[in-house]
Amino acid sequence: MSTNSSIKKVVLAYSGGLDTSVIVKWLQETYNCEVVTFTADIGQGEEVEPARAKAEALGVKEIYIDDLREEFVRDYVFPMFRANTIYEGEYLLGTSIARPLIAKRLIEIANETGADAISHGATGKGNDQVRFELGAYALKPGIHVIAPWRDWDLTSRETLMDYCAKHNIPVDYTKAKKKSPYSMDANLLHISYEGGILEDPWAEAEEDMWRWSVSPEAAPDQPEYLELTFKHGDIVAIDGVEMSPATVLETLNKRGGAHGVGRLDIVENRYVGMKSRGCYETPGGTIILRAHRAIESITLDREVAHLKDSLMPKYAEMIYNGYWWSPERQMLQTAIDNSQGPVNGDVRVKLYKGSVTVVGRRSNDSLFDEKIATFEDDAGAYNQKDAEGFIKLNALRMRIAAQKGRKLL
């Protein structure tokens, strides 16, 4: 690849691992440019500060290490769950929802440092390249994006290690070191596993793969109950204790994981065209989704709830495919957020051997009317004779069709 002399400074999404450490040196050599590294703490459970020393050893002068955990949950995870979002009926979008925040921060740092370009370590086969770059172009249309995995001739871990040896790149790997058989990605919402034996969709994942949860079979024999308090669609307290968004998710991850909640094994349709198998642990998100639907069940108008449900698959697709910063996602978000005004109250859930069961819900904004819903004497609150006219009017079009000879059988 020829160098581009117009690029003087590049902001790299930097983990401190093998791939992105190689990318730092490759950018320096290929573009003869200055590299700014950006490392985000979004709850991946690893120390991010060591990335500073690694970047310094590679000659990086401008190093950003940002704690984005609260922003991630407050501005991305919670808004997503207000829509009860799942992709293809199962996936809670743990990886997808983290990418818009990283893209935004890359652009902010590019603006702050006067960088000409941004770079990432996503491969040319996956969805993340699309998510990062769609976000970047939406937020800064003229930005250059450098995706080394689409350009260089380093095609394996072995060639990366050879590159490190040749260029004296300090990494915490050796050729002899045993590598995890899985490609993993983690943040406060989930941890994902791909590759290895999972590339055979018939092979069951090994038990020692799972890191956030016990197996449902080994979970406690006694259930645990949680009381979750909602305000405008977001959880603000657990068992009466007010918490920040990130603390809510951290707490639910621990409590749910201890009971084997949130494991998922799916084959999903990637935006780039292929099918991919992944395993996920999303204990906190699984609890939030179940509880949020429960509080909406008593606080939302029926037609509002049904309309939200009809829009949700498209909203989920937007997030999965990388269109968080699109006008259509923002339009839907405005409608979704507007619906959450009355979504206040408490939900009681039971965690037991991999399951989340809603066992109670209450709200001062509840539309549930016991006097009308009762099977006992409703004291005239509901006139059952009214149902006859309701049924006949709704049957009218079908009766006319039958009278005109339309055959159904």
From Swiss-Prot:
Biological process per Gene Ontology, one example term: argininosuccinate metabolic process
EC number of the protein: 6.3.4.5
Entry annotated with the keyword Ligase: yes
PROSITE patterns tied to this protein: ARGININOSUCCIN_SYN_1, ARGININOSUCCIN_SYN_2
Catalysis: reaction(s): L-citrulline + L-aspartate + ATP = 2-(N(omega)-L-arginino)succinate + AMP + diphosphate + H(+)
Disulfide bonds: none
InterPro entries membership: Arginosuc_syn_C, Arginosuc_syn_N, Arginosuc_synth, Arginosuc_synth_CS, Arginosuc_synth_type_1_subfam, AS_cat/multimer_dom_body, Rossmann-like_a/b/a_fold
Binding site for L-aspartate: T123, N127, D128
Residues at which L-citrulline binds: Y91, S96, N127, R131, S183, S192, E268, Y280
Subunit details: Homotetramer.
HAMAP family reported in the protein's UniProt record: Arg_succ_synth_type1 (MF_00005)
Family that this chain belongs to: Belongs to the argininosuccinate synthase family. Type 1 subfamily.
Annotated PANTHER family: ARGININOSUCCINATE SYNTHASE
Name the UniProt record assigns to this protein: Argininosuccinate synthase
Organism listed in the record: Saccharophagus degradans (strain 2-40 / ATCC 43961 / DSM 17024)
Taxonomic placement: Bacteria, Pseudomonadati, Pseudomonadota, Gammaproteobacteria, Cellvibrionales
